[in-house]
Amino acid sequence: MKEYITVIGGGLAGSEAAYQIAKREIKVKLYEMKPDKFSPAHSNTNLAEIVCSNSFKSNLHTNACGLLKEELRMLDSLLIKTADEVAVPAGQALAVDRERFSQEITKKLESLENVEIIRKEVGKSGDRNTETNFLESKDNNDEIKSMPTEMENSKSTKENNIECGVEQKDVISLEQLSKDGIVIIATGPLTSDALSWEIVKLTGDEGLHFYDAAAPIIEKESIDMSIAFWGDRYSQERGKDEDVETWQERIKNSNENNYINLPMNKEEYEKFWNELVKAEVVELHNFEKREIFEGCMPIEVMAKRGIDTLRYGPLKPVGFTDPRTGKRPYAIVQLRQDNSEGNLFNMVGFQTNLKYGEQKRVFSLIPGLQNADFAKYGVMHRNTFINSPELLDETYNLKKNRNIFFAGQITGVEGYVESIASGLVAALNSVEMYERLNREEQSRTNIKTTNMSRKGLSLMRQITFPKETMIGALSKYIASENKNFQPMNANFGILPELPERIKDKKLKYGKLADRALDKLSGILQ
């Protein structure tokens, strides 16, 4: 067994993981491909580089991300502590000087005796023809037709060296690093092609997605059920020879509650359509445009093909009867359950690239969603992430290879703080595994770490957090069964409901936050 834990990726999750391991007096080898190679979005050589907004969102406990940050402060997160130190004025939000932030994280990790930072790319491409053919034929639920290649958009230092006659050093493979050792993969949404290929081989054909094209997710209790109704297409519809009373009794007693349906009349639909086609969209990066739009069309783009296009697509009303009128609606929007608790619903077919404010404005025009609370807005961007519900448990541990953990956005958590949280959880559990295996090895039980089975480590103590905490709820979300899994950020919709119903949203979120912090305090004492 190797006398260290390997972390691949020096972003937010990987940097947090390396710190948490090192502070527990275990050696860490942290692999970072910069400056040897840069992704299309990265530009400096420091660890924990922030490439988008410099905001870590609200500090208020009545905000889901604010609660998550407070939990991480209680758990001695290096990155949140550093963010607090280099904060810039931002009202109630935590915003940072991005250059100072990444510089400080790099300096602190370099100063730790137990951390060795290795500036090399990890990943073995193998036969490029085989790889290309495989990935071009790969179809993840009709969402991806080919693997995006960052080589088309950026050129590595390594490639330039080859052209100048400088010898290229071989990259290190994931297979090599994980042999008889524990590995955390924290390579983010722009994971390199070579490592992506190894992850595909590790997780299987359906294990890896290359972009995020997600519809908005809505909190169920904010849906107006005096307008919306339950039912599946065709079975909910009133039969030609079925009288109204019989039909109403049938649908009332029906167990087919897979969808919440939002009916629209002609006037409502045309008002919605007019606002949708003129709404503002997010400008995509050049490297994102090709792969996203060839695999999944945004609803606003589809709408611009004609006023009735949506009515023959995701908003087709065939197979439904509006309980209020007894007639087929002019158009219908369907919501599908998104989590096992049944308190989050996604908008079917509403993958979108609209700005967040525009999503709130336009989608609230849909009858039944006039007061909707959006747990997550729709997004379309390059985002490499694994099918976590199939592959990981709540500790971010790979089920079929127990010596491998994942952390960060590659697991399907979305956001800076969420990535940090996942890195912390993965690190704590990798330490637990390391110490257990080290004890076993010392007692000569000859337990190997490569390709560990769940059975082989059935006695391994796992470090999980209460589901009432935000850090625990995120871990549970990515590990829970979900046939339509999409990345998720911190939001109060993923927490268990309070025993009492509270209409005042601020009061409700305050009580959820108090409960979370009490639960976390309880296990830390």
Identify the residue ranges that each predicted region occupies.
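Predominantly flavin-linked oxidoreductase catalytic cores and closely associated redox partners
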Residues: 115-128, 166-335, 349-356, 360
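A glycine-rich dinucleotide-binding beta-alpha-beta segment and adjacent secondary-structure elements
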Residues: 346-413, 420-421, 463-476, 487, ...
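C-terminal auxiliary extensions adjacent to catalytic cores
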Residues: 485-525
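Beta1/beta-strand and adjacent pyrophosphate-binding region of the FAD-binding site
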Residues: 2-13
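An active-site-proximal "capping" alpha-helix that borders the catalytic cofactor pocket
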Residues: 419-433
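Helical element adjacent to the flavin cofactor pocket in flavoenzyme catalytic cores
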Residues: 98-117
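N-terminal FAD cofactor-binding segment of flavoenzymes
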Residues: 19-80
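Active-site-proximal substrate-binding core of FAD-dependent oxidoreductases
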Residues: 431-438, 446, 451-488
